[in-house]
């Protein structure tokens, strides 16, 4: 998988996750951000990406369960934490990891792409034109 494919998979997985909730107003918290991963900088890279929206529901546990079930359907290992706020964590599947947080104030979906061959510095230069 190329770095671009890993990034695109991350973005589509995060944004697709938002569609399982009855929530409008989702917006990215910034462009996908490339960085080094693994133990040899310059040889492997991954991206981080976040998406947020104001919650329309107050049933945070039910929304978290919807996200957890969706991620399980993608073949991910899922863990739900309910204190101090409800957070869903997932690893595996099409990305390295994802989290869904219900607070404070906004819903957040954050993810990290798979670690793939590539130089983060060169990828950053390419992304910035």
Residue ranges and their predicted role:
Residues 1-43, 54-55, 61:
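N-terminal leader/targeting segments
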Residues 6-13, 27-28, 112-113, 118-129:
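C-terminal basic regulatory modules in eukaryotic proteins
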Residues 29-36, 86, 90, 128:
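A sequence-level detector of short, solvent-exposed, charge-rich linear segments
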Residues 37-47, 92-96:
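A short, glycine/Asx- and small/polar-enriched loop/turn
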Residues 43-49, 122-126:
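Extracellular/mature segments of secreted proteins
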Residues 46-53, 111:
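Oligomerization/assembly interface segments of phage tail-like spikes and tubes
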Residues 55-120:
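Extracytosolic low-complexity repeat regions of secreted or lipid-anchored proteins
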């Amino acid at each position: 998988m190329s770095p671009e494919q890993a990034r695109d998979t991350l973005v589509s997985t995060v944004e697709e996750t938002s569609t399982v909730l009855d929530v409008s107003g989702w917006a990215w918290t910034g462009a996908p951000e490339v960085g080094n991963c693994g133990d040899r900088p310059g040889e492997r890279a991954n991206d981080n990406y976040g998406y947020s929206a104001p919650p329309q529901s107050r049933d945070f546990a039910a929304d978290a369960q919807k996200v957890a079930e969706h991620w399980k359907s993608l073949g991910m290992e899922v863990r739900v934490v309910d204190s101090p706020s409800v957070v869903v964590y997932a690893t595996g599947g099409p990305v390295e990891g994802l989290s869904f947080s219900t607070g404070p104030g906004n819903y957040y979906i954050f993810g990290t792409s798979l670690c793939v061959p590539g130089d983060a510095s060169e990828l950053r230069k390419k992304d910035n034109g």
